[in-house]
C-alpha cells in the first residue's frame, strides 16, 4: 500500500506511464503466423478453376493462388496491405532512422511480442523526434512493414509462414521467385 502510494507520486520513474503509452501506441497490433493453422485446400480437377486464398500472417498477408489466363499459368500472389504515397514516405523516413536506432540484435529478443514491443518503441521514439503524427490504422500497416523488413526476410517473409511451401527459389535479378507448393507443385510468385 505504501509502495503503491509512492509509485503513484513518482510515476514515470517506474516506467508504468511509459509502458502504458507504448501499449496504447501499439494497441490492436499483433503478428499472428498462420503456419501452425490447419488450412484445408480444395481439390481442383481442372487447374484453370484454381482460385484459393488463405492467411499467412494474420491479418496482413495472404496467399492467393489462381490460374492466370493471360500468363496461362498458376500464380502465387502474396497479398499485403498497400501503402498510400504518404504512408510510403513515412515508411522510408522510419526505415532510414530505424537503421541507425536499432541497438540490439533482434535474435536476442526471443519472442515475436518482444520484437514487436522493441520495434514499436523505436517507431514511437523516431516519430516523436521527427514530429510525425501517425494515425492508428496507418500505424498498424507501417508496423507490419517494419516488422517484416527488420525482423523478417522483407518480401519473402510471408512465404516463410506458409505451411505448404517446401522450397523457395530465385534464379537471379528481375526473374520471378518460384515456390514449390506441396499441393500445387512449382508456382511462379508475384515477387521479383
Region annotations inferred by a language model:
Residues 35, 51-65, 69-86, 95-192:
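N-terminal "pre-motor" subdomain/linker immediately upstream of P-loop NTPase catalytic cores
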Amino acid at each position: 500500500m505504501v509502495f503503491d502510494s509512492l509509485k503513484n507520486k513518482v510515476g514515470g520513474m517506474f516506467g508504468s506511464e511509459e509502458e502504458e503509452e507504448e501499449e496504447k501506441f501499439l494497441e490492436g497490433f499483433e503478428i499472428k503466423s498462420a503456419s501452425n493453422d490447419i488450412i484445408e485446400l480444395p481439390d481442383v480437377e481442372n487447374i484453370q478453376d484454381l482460385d484459393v486464398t488463405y492467411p499467412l500472417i494474420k491479418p496482413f498477408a495472404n496467399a492467393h493462388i489462381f490460374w492466370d489466363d493471360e500468363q496461362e499459368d498458376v500464380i502465387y500472389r502474396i497479398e499485403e496491405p498497400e501503402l498510400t504515397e504518404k504512408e510510403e514516405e513515412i515508411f522510408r523516413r522510419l526505415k532510414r532512422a530505424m537503421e541507425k536506432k536499432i541497438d540490439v540484435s533482434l535474435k536476442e529478443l526471443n519472442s515475436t511480442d518482444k520484437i514487436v514491443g522493441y520495434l514499436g518503441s523505436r517507431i514511437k521514439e523516431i516519430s516523436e523526434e521527427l514530429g510525425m503524427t501517425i494515425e492508428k490504422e496507418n500505424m498498424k500497416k507501417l508496423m507490419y512493414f517494419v516488422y517484416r523488413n527488420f525482423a523478417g526476410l522483407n518480401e519473402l517473409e510471408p512465404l516463410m509462414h506458409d505451411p505448404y511451401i517446401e522450397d523457395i527459389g530465385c534464379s537471379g535479378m528481375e526473374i520471378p521467385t518460384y515456390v514449390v507448393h506441396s499441393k500445387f507443385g512449382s508456382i511462379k510468385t508475384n515477387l521479383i
